Amino acid sequence: NLPELLKAALLEQGYDVKDINITVGTNYEATGEAMAAGTVDLGWLPGGTYALFSDDVDVILTATRAGLSNDSEDPKTWNGDANKTLKNGPQVTFYRSLIYATPSAYGKELAAKVNAGEKLTWEDLDKATWAVQKTSSSAGYIYPSMWLMANYDGKKISDLSNVMPIDSGYGTAFSYAA
């Protein structure tokens, strides 16, 4: 089990730890609040949550991850069987967030525009129904908001007409598209 694996790994590094208690927070904010209150000793969180609680916590570990075979900023190069993306790239220190078009009629219309090389207008995006995560989610809120601001005259997710907050995970978010 994970506590035993952690104890063994720490012992290899010269740390003889007797007890490890692992809990899973109900969401990023709850974990950040527990860290700020001192009711837990360590937490593993995305950068967006760190930004909210940075006055109360310190970073002690960072991790990299394998990059993807596709690192293009051109959305049409991510689509279709010929552009299948694999997790076989080099270690990277960044995080990529993607905005997906669902199989809804309007989602297909937006995807067709992008795949034809057309830039989506603010009106195109504003007409869509957006599923987003909590405001502390890097990939599910912060990065898409930053992308909108950079590409649509400072507009943000909060400026969109049809936003559906999803706070129960990405799987649930995708199930709404079905």
Q: Which residues fall in each region the model found?
A:
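Extracytoplasmic
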Residues: 17, 37, 45-47, 54, ...
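A conserved helix-loop-strand patch within extracytoplasmic ligand-binding domains
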Residues: 65-138
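Pocket-lining segment of extracytoplasmic ligand-binding domains
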Residues: 114, 126-178
